[in-house]
Amino acid sequence: DLIIVSFGTNEAHSRRYLAQAHKMQIGRLLGMLKAACPEAAFLLTTPPGAYVGRRRARTINPRTVTAARIIKEYAQEHKMAVWDMYNIVGGKTDACRNWTKHHMLRADGIHFTPDGYRLQGNLLHQALIKAYNEYVATGLE
């Protein structure tokens, strides 16, 4: 079994976001999941990027980059796979701009249109198939 866990958008939305508290929350949730599913493998994903603020004063969420880093650190420290959607779609400078430019974000600047969610799913699917094909080709884990 593979459990895919996506973190970061909601956690980083709060102005009171604390990176170490986020890391502890990840650990608690994954601890419960591991206890319930001890044989499962885990894949963590970073957030896709989001805006904060009201329409006219909306800015790219500056905390998302930290949330993505914390998720990657946690995955590395616990030998878990991570798919870094945040950097794949443009990272700090372009993730939100790319989503907006292609009309894949809803008006709230946080949630996605159906096409935006489909694209995220397709990108993850492509990454999983690529990793599987590399695994089969090399026989390495």
For every predicted segment, state its role.
Residues 49-141:
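Catalytic His-Asp segment of secreted/periplasmic serine-dependent ester chemistry enzymes
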Residues 17-25, 59-66:
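Alpha-helix N-cap and loop-to-helix initiation/capping positions
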Residues 2-6, 41-46, 81-85, 111:
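Structural recognition of the beta-strand scaffold that forms the well-ordered cores
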Residues 32-33, 127:
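A generic secondary-structure signal
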Residues 35-37:
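Short, conserved loop/helix-junction motifs that constitute active-site signature segments
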Residues 1-23:
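Oxyanion-hole/transition-state-stabilizing segment in secreted/luminal serine hydrolases
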Residues 26-31, 68, 72:
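Generic structural signal for well-ordered alpha-helices
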Residues 10-12, 48-51:
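Short, catalytically relevant binding-site loops at active-site mouths
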